[in-house]
């Protein structure tokens, strides 16, 4: 059985240290420590970032977004997180997307730097 017994009653939801959130099977008010936790996602893992048709935003538009909103595009603001919390699995996917985008930006910059080094070498020869 997947039920939890608390005393002499069966509980469908479990709350520890406070009241339970109506949409949760387990609610913990306070710190919880795990040796291991597994999150299973039904959403896309961001491998799509490396697809040839992925629309990587130009860095100047990312900068404009940050200046206007004080957070990265597609990442919740501090206020949103404070008010609504976050889904750990979805947040891991968002953070991985940002890491993969940073990798693509670094590759672009590396290619530009290599091209500039070659151009400088050519100019020095002439």
Predicted regions and their residues:
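C-terminal intramolecular chaperone/autoprocessing and neck/assembly modules of extracellular spikes
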Residues: 2-8, 12-91, 112-126
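Terminal processing/anchoring signals of secreted or surface-associated proteins
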Residues: 16, 62, 98-99, 106
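Short, charged low-complexity intrinsically disordered segments located at boundaries
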Residues: 88-100
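Long, heptad-repeat coiled-coil alpha-helices used as oligomerization/scaffolding rods
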Residues: 95, 102, 106-109, 116
């Amino acid at each position: 059985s997947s039920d939890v017994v608390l005393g002499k009653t069966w509980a469908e939801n479990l709350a520890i240290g406070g009241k339970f959130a109506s949409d949760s099977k387990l609610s913990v008010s306070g710190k919880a420590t795990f040796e291991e936790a597994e999150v299973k996602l039904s959403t896309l893992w961001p491998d799509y970032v490396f697809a040839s048709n992925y629309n990587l935003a130009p860095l100047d538009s990312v900068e404009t977004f940050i200046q206007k909103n004080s957070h990265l595009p597609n990442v919740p603001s501090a206020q949103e997180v404070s008010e609504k919390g976050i889904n750990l699995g979805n947040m891991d996917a968002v953070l991985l997307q940002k890491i993969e985008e940073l990798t693509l930006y670094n590759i672009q910059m590396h290619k530009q730097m290599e091209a500039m080094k070659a151009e400088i070498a050519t100019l020095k020869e002439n």
